[in-house]
Regions:
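Short recognition patches in nucleic-acid-associated and regulatory proteins
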Residues: 12-55
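Compositionally biased, non-globular sequence tracts
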Residues: 42-50, 61-68, 94
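Short cysteine/histidine-rich metal-coordination sites, predominantly Zn2+-binding motifs
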Residues: 32-44, 79-92
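Short Fe-S-cluster ligation motifs
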Residues: 48-56, 93-107
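Acidic, low-complexity intrinsically disordered segments
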Residues: 53, 59-83, 87
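Short, charged surface segments at domain edges that flank catalytic/cofactor-binding sites
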Residues: 2-9
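Intrinsic disorder/low-complexity segments, especially N-terminal tails and targeting/processing regions
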Residues: 15-18, 62, 90, 101
Length: 107
């Protein structure tokens, strides 16, 4: 299977236009870990159940909650391209629950 690529401007992960059409300003994109689980980015509060801790190695991914495509931020920042790293089930299961929790924490 060929690698899919999202559109991105420069080397800026906040400009990703996911293959499904979602953007940061659309339905939103979420910072995630290497398993596609949304991470808790506020180190002043405990990590809510269901979310992942911020990775110690700072290896962050961007999750599209609309379609489940996941992009590796380091690749985008280094190459200016946004290949899909992998996909997760954003509609059901633990990732879907983590997405729900993320939006509750970040309305």
């Amino acid at each position: 299977m060929e690698t899919e690529y999202a559109d991105v401007t420069g080397h800026d992960v906040t400009t990703i236009i996911c293959l499904c059409g979602n953007t940061v300003d659309g339905e939103g994109l979420i910072q995630a870990n290497s398993e596609g689980i949304p991470v808790h980015g506020d180190d002043s509060t405990p990590v809510p159940a269901g979310l992942a801790e911020w990775p110690e190695d700072e290896d962050i991914y961007t999750l599209c909650p609309k379609c489940g495509r996941v992009y590796r931020d380091a690749v985008i920042e280094e190459t200016g391209t946004a290949p899909v790293a992998f996909r997760v089930d954003a509609a059901s299961g633990p990732v879907a629950e983590a997405i729900r929790i993320h939006w509750e924490q970040n309305p």
